[in-house]
Amino acid sequence: MSQFEKQKEQGNSLFKQGLYREAVHCYDQLITAQPQNPVGYSNKAMALIKLGEYTQAIQMCQQGLRYTSTAEHVAIRSKLQYRLELAQGAVGSVQIPVVEVDELPEGYDRS
């Protein structure tokens, strides 16, 4: 397993434990290690959404979407688009329930 994958797994584990700030730190390291890999941006965006930091989440989604042009990143692009919509919808509202999903809602490319 690559260092990138180990760091991603650590971040995902922290996320699942509800340690979103710590997960953000792990995902920052992913972005630093591979700035053109959209996975770090996508994962960080979801952790930021959980923290209620919607503006930063929007920025992460927008940055990540710059790097989703390859076929292998189609699923990540869909996640980024979904998370961008979640964060944009939350900006200005009091609070909306946000849940992580293993399956994307209808209308999002699942490839």
From Swiss-Prot:
Repeat in keyword set: yes
Membrane-crossing segments per the record: none
SMART domains linked: TPR
TPR repeats: 4-37, 39-71
Compartments, as annotated in UniProt: Cytoplasm; Nucleus
GO BP terms, alphabetized: box C/D snoRNP assembly; protein folding; protein stabilization
Protein name: TPR repeat-containing protein associated with Hsp90
Provenance organism: Saccharomyces cerevisiae (strain ATCC 204508 / S288c) (Baker's yeast)
Gene for this chain: TAH1
